[in-house]
């Protein structure tokens, strides 16, 4: 086992133990709001292997919104890939996103070996299709909870710049 993997394994286990009260509390709050506490999304990992990336649920299901709003959301997501003030984000979801608490379940991804503590952000197949030939560089790394994108301004970094990172 490589030293980075040993570090990731030990550090993620220790961090999970340290933040377990927060993990449990957030899971309970989300469950009480009627949503499943954990959101899973398919992401591309090392060597192009797909894995379930875990996050705390921070949005309501789009089908719970009026059809006009659903259509507007889908148009903007298709055009831009994201929304600045997404109406699906819950009040509690906005707070856990702002504080990055929504990403704490990714410590389990690190524990399971799908992710590392430090590496490029895990991306979806939709995003990978935009990478072009650069996707081959991405596939050579284990995705991480934190990396250069987060410390370089996070959401303020333009998408093309993020791909280059």
Can you annotate each of these PLM segments?
Residues 1-63:
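A hydrophobic, helix-centered structural microdomain
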Residues 3-7, 53, 85-89, 104, ...:
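Alpha-helical membrane-protein architecture signal
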Residues 31, 36, 104-165:
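Hydrophobic structural segments characteristic of membrane proteins
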Residues 39-88, 146-164:
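Short, glycine-rich, amphipathic interfacial segments at transmembrane boundaries or analogous
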Residues 96-106:
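Short acidic-aromatic low-complexity motifs
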């Amino acid at each position: 086992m490589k030293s980075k993997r040993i570090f990731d394994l030990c550090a993620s286990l220790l961090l999970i133990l340290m933040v377990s009260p927060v993990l449990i509390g957030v899971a309970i709050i989300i469950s009480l709001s009627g949503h499943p506490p954990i959101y899973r999304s398919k992401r591309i990992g090392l060597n192009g292997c797909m894995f379930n990336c875990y996050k705390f649920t921070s949005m309501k299901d789009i089908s719970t919104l009026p059809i006009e709003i659903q259509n507007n959301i889908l148009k903007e997501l298709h055009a831009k890939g994201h929304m600045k003030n997404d109406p699906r984000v819950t009040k509690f979801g906005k707070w856990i996103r702002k504080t990055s608490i929504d990403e704490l379940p990714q410590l389990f991804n690190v524990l399971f070996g799908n992710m590392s503590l430090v590496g490029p952000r895990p991306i979806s197949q939709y995003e990978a299709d935009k990478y072009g030939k650069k996707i081959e560089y991405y596939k050579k790394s284990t995705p991480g909870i934190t990396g250069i994108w987060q410390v370089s301004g996070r959401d303020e970094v333009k998408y093309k710049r993020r791909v280059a990172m």
